Amino acid sequence: MAKRALGLGKSKKQKKQKVAVPEEQSSEGTVPAPSAANQIEIALDENEDADDELVQLKGLWETFLKDKDNQLLLNGVVHECDRLLRLQDNDSTIKLSDLFHSIYAQALAELTVFLPEETDDEEKKYERMNEFFDAALERYRLGAEKYPETPLLSLTQTKIILQRIPLQYISQLSPLDQNDEKYKLYDLLESAKSSYTLSSNQHQLAYDVLLSFYDLLDIIETFEDKEELEDGLDSDDEGEELVEVVLHENHPLTKIKKNMNQNYEWLKENLLNLFNDISSSFCNKVGPDIDKDHPTVVLFKSIARTLGQLYLKLAEEPSKTFAELMYDSDDEEQTDKEALEKAKNAQSKAIPLVEYAIRYLQEAKVEDEPQTWVDVAEAIIDLGNLYDYESKEQEDSYKRAEEILLKANKATHGKYQVILDNLLNKD
């Protein structure tokens, strides 16, 4: 891979440092060593010691996080960690912090992402993946022995487990499996949730962990979809419906799927805690003229957007129930007292969820990013759809959404015309 200089120097309070990737083989023999000729330019904060090797490692790791497809950078992180361990072996005065152990553990876990590119042998790939994840968790454990109270290492453990479940285990599963005792994925997921800890100086890592959890829930929730699609494609009857796949009681994912509501509730609660922590510790202490590209501002808006999307996700089921009973059923069912009561219950559940979604999507708005305005408008349309037909609340919602879409459409020279037309053509 060709070398490239990677600078993070958007801030005037940063200075650049070139770090040579070491030539030696990894002490564990895990990674092919890059050439010493490769030098990577990293950016350090102005108040950090550019000669401090742990500072350089942190800068190298943060550079990789901005370019996670760059295996050269990742190999450089692992080799630098190995080198620092060897230095410590020869000099007992060298202290390796909890941050060192966290970076090393995360880097070992990240190496698994590149394994599909290295071999097509599934058995060998699984063995290598198992080695890397075991090494990552062992590095976490060694760090936790030295720093037992650090939230950073607890978050690191959660992150590694949430990577391992889909990459190593779910990738091996089929809908026909009945080997829950082999993987014990429910217990593994619960252990990841238990080790999650929010720390005021680890907001970005906490958000990354919660995003991984969100992605994992989506993978588990849609696990059967691929099998259903493949069965449908194999069918000779074009009119034949897809056959629903039902997992066996002893399938490794069954217990997790039965507890999806609790998992989404856990995700929502921890995203809210993270959002509120940043709001109180940062946003309430800065002025309105804060740079929109400030890392904490970007993170805050990303969390708000994720919360908005999550609330819309949680509103999907009651919204669907309401729409089916009120608009997709026959006239007799629409006047049935029991069906109407069920529709009203679904409506009362969905409306507050969509209102929360709108609130957080508004927090996520960026003045010069029209898509963030449209996200709000589409949520307002969803809210309008939940109000009684042709009610004042419904008409007001559609009007609000129309005003936002007109502004966004004008700013983007017609990019959102289809959405706008669909709104204006509502019966």
UniProtKB/Swiss-Prot annotation:
It holds the Pfam family Nro1. This is Enhancer of translation termination 1. Belongs to the ETT1 family. The gene is ETT1. GO terms for cellular component: nucleus. Keywords: Nucleus, Transcription, Transcription regulation, Translation regulation. It comes from Kluyveromyces lactis (strain ATCC 8585 / CBS 2359 / DSM 70799 / NBRC 1267 / NRRL Y-1140 / WM37). Its main location: nucleus. Required for correct translation termination and probably involved in regulation of hypoxic gene expression. GO terms for biological process: positive regulation of SREBP signaling pathway; regulation of translation. It comes from the Eukaryota. Residues 1-37 are annotated as: Disordered. It is found in: Nucleus.
